[in-house]
Amino acid sequence: MALFLHKEQTIKIYLYDQKKIMKLFASTILISLMAFSTHAQVTIIGVTLPATIKAGDSNLSLNGGGIRKKVFFKLYVGGLYLSEKSSDAAAIVNADKPMAVKLQITSGMISSENMSEAILEGFEASTGGKTEPLKAKIAAFVNTFKKDEIVEGNVFDIVYVPGKGVESYKNGKLQGTIEGMDFKKALFGIWLGSKPADDDLKTAMLGK
């Protein structure tokens, strides 16, 4: 039909089509960038949390990360990894799905002894003081932090694999495995429960 249009009309139609193409192209690029940023690594006070990690055969993506602080000290950087994004803390804690928490020590104030004490306090808060049914499992988990001294730069991966349990890694080396959903819920509740170790870290882990 362009044969029957004036030259100016043909040019206007051409320019209109070009604008539509450019808008479509720009939208595609924006969507791609948003998808990339959702699964991008994050650097916090010099610590880089990778975009993805493995939990058994599952690939997990970084849901959010932040800093565990106490008074003026930045104790560690923590990241939460899930199979799909979520900001629902209770749903995450109760889910029988692959997930993980990565911790990198950023302070010389952390030692094996006070890390173990902090974990015990975390379980007390997470369970509302009802730790007796999990006593043996908690003790076994805490012992994995006592095998060697903890120093700044150490990395801990706490990985839940359904049907297998919670695997605890220090600097990539498996320290132990604790079975049971009851234990998994109490453990992840340390960071995501109603009385978390750090409110700001919880919010950051949830990607808020």
Model-inferred region functions:
Residues 3-21:
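Short, Lys/Arg-enriched N-terminal segments with co-localized hydrophobic residues
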Residues 10, 34-35, 65, 180:
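Ubiquitous "structural anchor" signal
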Residues 21, 36-40:
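Sec/Tat signal peptide C-region and signal peptidase I cleavage site
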Residues 22-26:
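Gram-positive Sec-dependent secretion signals
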Residues 27-35:
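Bacterial N-terminal signal peptides
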Residues 40-208:
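Terminal leader/tail segments of proteins
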